[in-house]
Amino acid sequence: MHLLAGLDRPTNGRVKIGGEDITEMPDKQLTKLRRRHIGFVFQQFNLLPMLTAEENILLPLSIAGRKPDKAAVAALIARVGLGDRLGHKPSQLSGGQQQRVAIARALASQPTVLFADEPTGNLDSTSGTEVLQLLREAVELDRQTTVMVTHDPRAAAAADRVLFLADGEIVNDLASPSEEQILVAMKEATHR
């Protein structure tokens, strides 16, 4: 994921985001590209504790010097179900609510690609299901490209395509697999 997001540089091959080759892009230009084209959702939420939910959601736009589209942000907040929690700080929110803030923050800038690193890893099954539904809605309603890294077969089954990695290599590629197909492929990948 770090290679795809331009956080690390590949030793060979090319990486393109939004049609732009980022493989040898200078750091300043790469930072600007990430601000414009990439959203991140992490397992640990990475919300700033001194900011409210609303301030956390709008932070990437502020950093990028972009004015928020108030209607789009309001629709996003309604979609993630946080309208009544915008004035709350992260410590006043449940884990599921914090992850919904993180998803709204990542989507607020309308990125070309959303990277989700174990987005359900710290959540109970109900909150995890809600997060997967939000990511799925972003794909279906906004045509949002999403790359999710997970060890959870249930989470992976929400994807249109699942790649299996073992020892740094892609060892399997399944289109819209079931949870059972993923479990079989995971077992095969670990016993190669």
Model features per residue range: what roles?
Residues 1-159, 165:
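ABC family nucleotide-binding domain
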Residues 169-192:
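Conserved beta-strand-loop-alpha-helix hinge in the C-terminal portion
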